[in-house]
Amino acid sequence: MNFDYNKLLERASGVLSSKTKNESRLKIPEPDVIYEGKSTIIRNFIDITEMMNRDPEDVIKYLTKEFGIGAVLSGQRLIINRKVSEDEIQSKMNEYMATYVICYECKSPDTEIQKIGRTYLLVCKACGAQHPIRSNREIIENSNGIEIGKEYTVTIESTGSAGEGIARYQGYTIYVPKAKKGERVKIIIRKIKRNVAIAELADKK
């Protein structure tokens, strides 16, 4: 059976289109920063943490560790005990999002952190993925994406409406005709559109 990869890609993109509505939530507000003496004040700190749906104290612990300085919450504002540039603050906020908020699989921000034993897991409410919290370096090293014509090994996690296998890899949802749920298969990417890809089995008979 010959598959029309373009049609399959369009259908798959349509199925996942509702998930793209989350993209507007991926960008946190820019820090509203002012300086008083030697202190840096983020005036909209609580607005930022509410957008991320994370405990402000957890974000404060992350920032104080990254900057190596103390900080205190005062109402809606975070007061940092030395001057820090807006670019530095924005960079650390983005790193926090990538590490503790954004799903490593589908890139949805609808996640929560759960502790299982001694391990903290990032659990996605959108796709159901569960992964141990990674370091920012690990995320960067594993975020190179996929390329058309390249071969990858994936696990088929579910089945689409037309019977095609569905895998998730490097933030992409990959549709694989003839693949069955539970199989570990080698695939070749044929089409990519945003975070959706169509592949074929590398060892087709």
UniProtKB/Swiss-Prot annotation:
Entry keyword set: Initiation factor, Protein biosynthesis
One annotated GO molecular function: translation initiation factor activity
InterPro entries recorded: IF2/IF5, NA-bd_OB-fold, TIF2_bsu_arc, TRAM_dom, Transl_init_fac_IF2/IF5_dom, Transl_init_fac_IF2/IF5_N, Transl_init_fac_IF2/IF5_Zn-bd
Occurrences of domain TRAM (ranges): 145-203
Classification via Gene3D superfamilies: 3.30.30.170, Nucleic acid-binding proteins
Pfam families referenced in this protein's UniProt entry, alphabetically: eIF-5_eIF-2B, TRAM
Quaternary structure and interacting proteins, as annotated: Heterotrimer composed of an alpha, a beta and a gamma chain.
Function noted in UniProt: eIF-2 functions in the early steps of protein synthesis by forming a ternary complex with GTP and initiator tRNA.
PANTHER family from the UniProt entry: EUKARYOTIC TRANSLATION INITIATION FACTOR, EUKARYOTIC TRANSLATION INITIATION FACTOR 2 SUBUNIT 2
Family named by the database record: Belongs to the eIF-2-beta/eIF-5 family.
Protein name per Swiss-Prot or TrEMBL: Translation initiation factor 2 subunit beta
